[in-house]
């Protein structure tokens, strides 16, 4: 209704419910529902919504004229990236409201308002919010975007993940060390992700023992791999990190570094095929924010990319891959 002032709401004969995530819904309930997925907003879309609707709405609610408080585009973008972590704009509106409330206090102290709340027109003051003074109103930044490494790394690969609050980059680390265990997994992984890790491990053993990469045949008898995904307090699951895990393991085993400006997503099979994934729009947006230059995408997702707006893929080199050999050729510094 905010974005479509002339929208007519026709009441339907069945109930409609909205959810931020389907994970917590029971399977019998899901079987009786038609699921309509709505993608999250991009940074530019959030910026447009804030400028055209949210700022004006909060100015009116707090009794402020546009001549008294101005929020720059750069400040709004900093709020979106540094003070919110969501697919929508609810928290963004809360942060704008917080700025307005603090601005009212400062304006009152400056004599802009009389004791009865009326405007003192003799005092001419305008508060301008920029990215330079934003912390005075909202405090320190809450969220920081992980940026790409400057140099190639061994055993560290940047994957892409979909969450209920949008896309995120997912750093996967693998260390190879002397030991008798095959594979150790840490990082609060779900069952599906653990299975993906085991598939990746089996694939890496198969291609290294076949002689494609120079690894001693006794290597896996004498070494173990430890795979970790940082932010251990955050649960993680799903198969789309398969290609990332495989690349990180092979890099750790062979000592071949991985390009720091490459991100990837895709499910992998035991034979190295790369399968389609979901949440591609959000994942690509996360890759752009992290400063990635190249993104490896399953070839089966070509049709999904064609449906995306150009602004989402601008600045990204998308490489479609159908198997792990293509992933490794694009990711490893050979």
Regions found by a protein language model. Name each.
Residues 2-21, 69-71, 221-223:
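AAA+/SF3 P-loop NTPase mechanochemical coupling elements
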Residues 22-31, 39-97, 102-122, 207-218, ...:
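Conserved C-terminal "switch" segment of AAA+ ATPases
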Residues 37-39, 228:
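Conserved beta-strand segments of the P-loop GTPase G domain that flank and frequently precede/overlap
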Residues 72-174, 180-186:
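Conserved catalytic-core segments of large NTP-driven translation/proteostasis enzymes
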Residues 119, 125-126, 144-149, 153-158, ...:
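Peripheral, non-AAA+ core regions of ATP-driven protein-machinery
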């Amino acid at each position: 209704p905010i974005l479509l002032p002339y929208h007519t709401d026709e009441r339907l004969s069945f109930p409609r419910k909205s959810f931020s995530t389907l994970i917590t819904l029971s399977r019998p309930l899901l079987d009786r529902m038609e699921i309509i997925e709505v993608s999250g907003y991009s940074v530019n879309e959030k910026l447009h919504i804030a400028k055209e609707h949210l700022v004006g709405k909060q100015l009116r609610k707090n009794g402020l004229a546009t001549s008294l408080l101005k929020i720059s585009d750069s400040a709004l973008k900093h709020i979106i990236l540094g003070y919110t972590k969501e697919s929508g704009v609810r928290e963004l509106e809360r942060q704008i409201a917080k700025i307005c409330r603090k601005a009212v206090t400062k304006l009152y102290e400056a004599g802009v308002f009389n004791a009865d709340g009326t405007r003192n027109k003799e005092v001419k003051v305008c508060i301008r919010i920029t990215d330079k003074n934003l912390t005075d109103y909202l405090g320190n930044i809450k969220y920081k975007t992980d940026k790409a490494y400057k140099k190639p790394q061994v055993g560290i690969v940047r994957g892409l993940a979909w969450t209920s609050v949008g896309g995120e980059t997912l750093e996967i680390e693998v260390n190879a060390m002397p030991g008798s265990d095959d594979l150790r997994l840490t990082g609060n992984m779900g069952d599906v992700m653990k299975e993906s890790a085991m598939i990746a491990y089996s694939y890496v053993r198969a291609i290294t023992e076949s002689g494609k990469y120079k690894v001693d045949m006794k290597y896996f008898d004498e070494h173990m791999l430890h795979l970790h995904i940082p932010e251990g307090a955050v649960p993680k699951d799903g198969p789309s990190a398969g290609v990332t895990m495989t690349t990180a393991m092979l890099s750790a085993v062979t000592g071949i570094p991985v390009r720091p400006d490459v991100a990837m997503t895709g499910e992998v099979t035991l034979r190295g095929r790369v399968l389609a994934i979901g949440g591609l729009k959000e994942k690509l947006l996360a890759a752009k924010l992290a400063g990635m230059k190249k993104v490896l995408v399953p070839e089966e997702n070509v049709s999904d990319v064609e449906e995306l707006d150009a602004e989402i893929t601008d600045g990204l080199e998308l490489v479609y891959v159908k198997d792990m050999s293509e992933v490794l050729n694009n990711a490893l510094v050979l």
